[in-house]
C-alpha cells in the first residue's frame, strides 16, 4: 500500500495563522517524509516561527524567497513551484521515497487524520490522480462548506498521486494552477475528487486576501485569460452574485470585460483553451440532463 508523501506550504506574513497550521501537521497520524515551507519574503515573524519549528523537527525545512508584493496570480504559483522543485530535488538527493505530493496553504487548518484519510481514498481507487478535502469557512461561529464541485479538488489541502503530478507537467506558473492541474489530469484519464467529509478550514477565502472586489476582479481577468466560453462567465457571474455579500459577481464580470476590452493575452496552452471553450460546456450539459 502506498502512503508516503511530501508537503509544500507557501507562507507570506502568516504569523497569526502559521503556528496553528504547523501544529495541525505535527499532529497528523500520517506525517510527511518532508515538509517544505516556502517563506515568500515575509516582513513579520513568519521566518522566526518556521525556524523554531524546523530546529525541533528534522523533517521540516524552510526555503526563503526575496521580498515580493502579495500576488495571488503568477507569483503564488511561482512560490509553490519553487517549493515543489526543492522538495523533489531533496528527496532525490537523500533517496527519500514518496508516493504523493501535497499542498497546504498557511491559513488552512486540518484534522489530525486529514492526510491519512486522503491517502486511503487514493489507495482505494487507483484511478484517482488528485484529491482534496472539502473547504470550509468559519461564518458567525459556524463551520460552513463552500459548496464547491465535488469533481474539482481545492487548491489547498490537496494531494496528487506522484505519477499524475508529473504526467500533468507539475505545478505550472500560471494563474489558478490548481484548475489547470485538474484539467490536465482529467484529459489524461485520471479521476479527480473533493471529499467534503474530510474537513479543511480555510481561515480566509483566498480571493479575499486583498479584498472581495479585487480578488473577484482577478478571477474575471483569469477567466478571459483562459478563454472561457461567455456562457461559463455568465454562470460564474450568477453564482457569485446570489450569495452574500452579492457584489463579487460584478467584480468578476468587470475583470472579464477589462480583459476583453484590453485584448489581454490569453493562455498559450491549447488544451486548456479548448477545455473551457468546448468540453466544460458539455460537462455542464451532461449534468442537467434528465
For each feature predicted by the language model, list its residue ranges.
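Non-catalytic, C-terminal membrane-associated alpha-helical segments of glycosyltransferases
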Residues: 215-290
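Conserved nucleotide-sugar donor-binding
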Residues: 154-169
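Acidic donor-binding segment of Leloir-type glycosyltransferases
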Residues: 23-69
Amino acid at each position: 500500500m502506498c502512503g508516503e508523501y511530501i508537503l509544500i506550504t507557501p507562507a507570506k506574513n502568516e504569523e497569526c495563522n502559521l503556528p496553528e497550521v504547523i501544529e495541525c501537521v505535527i499532529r497528523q497520524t500520517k506525517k510527511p517524509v518532508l515538509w517544505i515551507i516556502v517563506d515568500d519574503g515575509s516582513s513579520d515573524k513568519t521566518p522566526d516561527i518556521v525556524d523554531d519549528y524546523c530546529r525541533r523537527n528534522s523533517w521540516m525545512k524552510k526555503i526563503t524567497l526575496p521580498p515580493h508584493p502579495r500576488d495571488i496570480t503568477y507569483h503564488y504559483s511561482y512560490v509553490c513551484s519553487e517549493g515543489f522543485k526543492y522538495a523533489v530535488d531533496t528527496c532525490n538527493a537523500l533517496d527519500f521515497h514518496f508516493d504523493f505530493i501535497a499542498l497546504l496553504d498557511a491559513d488552512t487548518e486540518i484534522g489530525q487524520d486529514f492526510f491519512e484519510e486522503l491517502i486511503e481514498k487514493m489507495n482505494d481507487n487507483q484511478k484517482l490522480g488528485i484529491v482534496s478535502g472539502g473547504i470550509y469557512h468559519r461564518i458567525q461561529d459556524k463551520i460552513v462548506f463552500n459548496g464547491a464541485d465535488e469533481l474539482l479538488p481545492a487548491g489547498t489541502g490537496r494531494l496528487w498521486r506522484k505519477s499524475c503530478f508529473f504526467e500533468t507537467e507539475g505545478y505550472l506558473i500560471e494563474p489558478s494552477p490548481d484548475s489547470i492541474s485538474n484539467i490536465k489530469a482529467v484529459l489524461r484519464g485520471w479521476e479527480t475528487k473533493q471529499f467534503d467529509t474530510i474537513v479543511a478550514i480555510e481561515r480566509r477565502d483566498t480571493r479575499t486576501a486583498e479584498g472581495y472586489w479585487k480578488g473577484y476582479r482577478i478571477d474575471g481577468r483569469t477567466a478571459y485569460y483562459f478563454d472561457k466560453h461567455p456562457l461559463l462567465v455568465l454562470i460564474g457571474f450568477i453564482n457569485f452574485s446570489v450569495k452574500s455579500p452579492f457584489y463579487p459577481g460584478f467584480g468578476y464580470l468587470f475583470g472579464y470585460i477589462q480583459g476583453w476590452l484590453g485584448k489581454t493575452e490569453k493562455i498559450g496552452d491549447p488544451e486548456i483553451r479548448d477545455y473551457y471553450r468546448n468540453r466544460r460546456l458539455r460537462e455542464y450539459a451532461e449534468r442537467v440532463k434528465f
